[in-house]
Amino acid sequence: MKRLMMAAAFVAGAAACLPAAAQFQKPEDAIKYRQGAFTVMAAHFGRVAGMAQGRVPYDAKVAAENIAVVMAVSKLPLTAFGEGTDKGAPNRAKPEIWRDAAGFKAAADKYVAELAKLDAAAKTGTLDALRGAVGAVGGTCKGCHDDYRAERYSQ
């Protein structure tokens, strides 16, 4: 619960910074911002995925709380992919993010749409509904990573 509260504080602080893109003084600030948001999303989605995969006992309330955090943070990283933020700090963003901005945005929008379905599935309170939706969200993550995230860090 303490971690959930810390994540909620992060979300509240990040939301207060919107529009964040205008506040990045240097490219490395944008890179660190988006990496932080992705780290929070991965941690909370990982908890839900663990339940769906049977590695962690299923708890409908905990699943819903974690999904709420992921949904709150899900749109934040996009504000940090502005022009010139491909370099400045070690990161794994491929040049295709900027070359194919429309495709990148479409992939992000698909992720957000699948998250909404995951949220609805979690509200049913059934593990079976959650399992299918977790797989769909994971598929959007993989698709975006395959196209837009490099395997190694670059600067």
Which residues fall in each region the model found?
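A periodicity- and composition-biased signal for non-globular, repetitive helical segments
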Residues: A8-A9, V40
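N-terminal signal peptide c-region/cleavage motif recognized by signal peptidases
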Residues: C17-P19
